[in-house]
Swiss-Prot record:
Organism: Bacillus mycoides (strain KBAB4) (Bacillus weihenstephanensis)
Protein family: Belongs to the Cyclase 1 superfamily. KynB family.
Stated name of the protein: Kynurenine formamidase
Binding site for substrate: 20
Disulfide bond annotation, renumbered to this chain: none
Active-site positions on this chain: 60
NCBIfam families per UniProt: trp_arylform
Subunit note: Homodimer.
Length: 209
């Protein structure tokens, strides 16, 4: 039996990728070339943790919150379900009630609202705070979205961020889902082992189950 191929659902990181307005631009350069070193090329990377496909740790929005290395890495590996929630301004309990989510631990939402990694969106569909308790009741431990944030871009309260982690639900942002169909997959989206960080870039991949 042929094993299903892994599918990349990450935004490629390059010097053209969009960043949050005012945040650190992404930059990669060869700072020590083979010609200079005599043996190797050595690259230098500068970026915000919240550029491209990434996870949030509670420390991102709570000074007393857990940091990346405190998070349970088991959450970022395992079965996941992709569902389509396109053409919605916001997503909460009401919009998900008709989906079969029993037994789902990781849920990825396709909004198809913004597919340009090199342009930061002006507005995005966001999650309403009431989604957190609903997802928790279903046993979901991770929510993934194909936009830069689970909250509105100009929001300062970050109600969805706070409520999701209050209910034990981890956040994965900026996944790329327009090239995959709805259904069940195995997900790997492991954060780097960053001791004091408020988030981490990830290489998110899926394969059909």
């Amino acid at each position: 039996m042929k094993t299903s191929q892994w599918i990349d659902i990450s935004q490629p990181l390059n010097n053209d990728i969009a960043t949050w307005p005012g945040d650190t631009p992404f930059s990669y350069e060869v700072s020590w070339s083979k010609e200079n070193s005599g043996s190797v090329n050595v690259g230098k990377l500068t970026m915000s943790i919240h550029t491209g496909t990434h996870i949030d740790a509670p420390f991102h929005f709570d000074n007393d919150g857990k940091k990346v290395l405190d998070l349970d890495i088991q959450v970022y590996v395992g079965p996941a379900r992709i569902i389509d929630v396109s053409n919605l301004e916001s997503i909460g309990k009401k919009e998900l009630e008709n989906f079969h989510l029993e037994g789902v631990e990781r849920l990825l939402l396709r909004t198809s609202s913004h597919g340009k990694a090199n342009e930061f969106p002006d507005v995005i569909p966001h999650l309403r705070a009431d989604i957190a308790a609903f997802l928790s009741e279903k046993g979901i431990r991770l929510i993934g979205v194909d936009v830069p944030s689970v909250d509105p871009l100009d929001d300062k309260e970050l109600a969805a961020h706070h409520q999701l982690f209050k209910h034990g639900i981890h956040i994965l942002e900026n996944v790329v889902l327009d090239h995959v169909v709805d259904g069940d997959y195995e997900l790997i989206a492991l954060p780097l082992a960053l001791t004091d960080a408020d988030g981490s870039p990830v290489r998110a991949v899926i394969r059909p189950i």
